[in-house]
């Protein structure tokens, strides 16, 4: 059973159709790494993350951010089964990468900020509420396989 209303789904999919995955993904992950520097420890292979400008200009940050948002696109197609959609990713992040599931919530909140910046007046309080519900659902699904 889905917690998403028809209005939520419309708000999420309508805005998603306008999102540039590469730009928004890179900015979202970059902001996460700048604002919450302890998250950098998961990205040792990305090279220099020594300053905000190094992070925001890092091609590996941009590429992984795009990968994250591409995965989010799958969630948007499967809003009624977020746990099923993210089952394997939850296992990977839990068992192999040992990522604290709280980081998924932080990333979702940063994404909402980036969407607000990129979409201005179109990002109404109602649209924000739908997106907050969605990123909270994704964070919960990604944390679902943790022991």
Curated annotation (Swiss-Prot):
One Gene Ontology MF term: haptoglobin binding
SUPFAM superfamilies with a match to the protein in the record: Globin-like
Modified residues (N6-acetyllysine): 60, 83
Gene Ontology cellular component terms for the protein in this record: blood microparticle; haptoglobin-hemoglobin complex; hemoglobin complex
Chain positions recorded as heme b binding sites: 64, 93
Keywords annotated in UniProt: Acetylation, Heme, Iron, Metal-binding, Oxygen transport, Phosphoprotein, S-nitrosylation, Transport
Biological processes, Gene Ontology terms: hydrogen peroxide catabolic process
Protein name: Hemoglobin subunit gamma-1
Organism of provenance: Sapajus apella (Brown-capped capuchin)
Lineage: Eukaryota, Metazoa, Chordata, Craniata, Vertebrata
